[in-house]
């Protein structure tokens, strides 16, 4: 099944919260997730000239702000992180940013999706051309929600998968190799364990 870009939010078997963002693409397969510094992971085209073909293929997909991690499928990563840095509650930062940025104005009206986690809390959110939702979710060890731009842009108990892996690297590889979701390109994970651990593939 092709669901495009998606987020996976859950806990490892050891009970450590994580979020993984995976790029799946038919149109722009030549992208990489790159750790830019201790607080940021960016999605970049391998050929930098592709940046001028589509405004939505280059963005920060992960941003760390103190004890909060933000992961999204677009430039709203920075907006959400900035609002949290200014002191907005997570729910409000998500709501404001998704409503302000709205869905992507491309040929598909691609939704914007987002996850924000701390060691104690997890929120999911999305905005489409017909809906917007923010929800605080409870996480269970070994299980994870997924939220995608195509076919699975919902926050529901019906969109849950089992996840294996103890480290950020292992979780990233698991999500990257998850065969049910087609056209993997690159992925990045934030794992909460003695602070934040970042991994990309």
UniProtKB/Swiss-Prot annotation:
NCBIfam families, alphabetically?
PRK04151.1 (NF003167), purO_arch (TIGR01922)
The annotated pathway is: Purine metabolism; IMP biosynthesis via de novo pathway; IMP from 5-formamido-1-(5-phospho-D-ribosyl)imidazole-4-carboxamide: step 1/1
What are the GO BP annotations of this UniProt entry? 'de novo' IMP biosynthetic process
Q: Which SUPFAM superfamilies match?
A: Archaeal IMP cyclohydrolase PurO (SSF75569)
Q: Which GO terms describe its molecular function?
A: IMP cyclohydrolase activity
Against HAMAP family, the record matches this protein to: IMP_cyclohydrol
- Function recorded in the entry: Catalyzes the cyclization of 5-formylamidoimidazole-4-carboxamide ribonucleotide to IMP.
Keywords attached to this Swiss-Prot or TrEMBL record, sorted alphabetically, are:
Hydrolase, Purine biosynthesis
Q: Which organism is it from?
A: Methanococcus maripaludis (strain DSM 14266 / JCM 13030 / NBRC 101832 / S2 / LL)
* InterPro entries documented for this protein: IMP_cyclohydrolase, IMP_cyclohydrolase-like, IMP_cyclohydrolase-like_sf
Regarding protein family, the annotation reads:
Belongs to the archaeal IMP cyclohydrolase family.
Name the encoding gene, please.
purO
Q: Does the keyword tRNA processing apply?
A: no
Which Pfam families does this chain map to? Answer: IMP_cyclohyd
Q: Which residues cross the membrane?
A: none
Q: Does the keyword Zinc apply?
A: no
* EC number(s) on file: 3.5.4.10
The name under which this protein is listed is IMP cyclohydrolase
Show the catalytic activity.
Answer: IMP + H2O = 5-formamido-1-(5-phospho-D-ribosyl)imidazole-4-carboxamide
